[in-house]
Amino acid sequence: ANLILNAGHDASTLAHSDELSVNSLLTQHLAQIVKEYDPWGTRPVTAGCNEPDPKNHLFKSGAIDVIGFNYHHQWVKDVPKNFPGKPFIFSESVSALQTRGFYMMPSDSIYKAPKEWWLPYCDPSFKCSAYDNMHASWSSTHEETWDVVKHHDFVGGQFIWTGFDYIGEPTPYAYPARSSYFGIIDLAGLPKDSYY
């Protein structure tokens, strides 16, 4: 069952004035359309926002019932101040990188791959550490984000990117890599360490 309706995802529209913009009005319109498909008329609307600033057009629209951030776990502590009284979820989180059965040492070091999202990342092994110590430049490890959830009671939950590896968006490697390394379950349907 759908518990929350989504009016937008991967949205990163930052406002530079106090006026409602076309993007804010569009968010209001999309939220209205989404609510029309709710047979009970009770489900709240969220959006997966890449920009967690309260000046984001989606938040400024007033149409978002549940604040949703994609990543940005370091901003969560500011949610009660920036969005008083609003429920909060991680609409997309983690994006840790792992290959089942491959471990990079030292295990207590964190590896960002690539260092910045626009830079290439090269390692001839085409593998990522399964110690939950490797993540994309915009994200965090499972443990790091889970720690934020555990220590902030107002966090209603998180949607981890992703449950399964998938063909496409090869991250952190480029060709000849053909799939993501994000999943807690690999392409063969076998759990990685972070699954447990």
Give the residues covered by each predicted segment:
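Short acidic loop-to-helix transition motifs that present clustered carboxylates
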Residues: A47-P54, H72-W75
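Short active-site oxyanion
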Residues: G62-I67
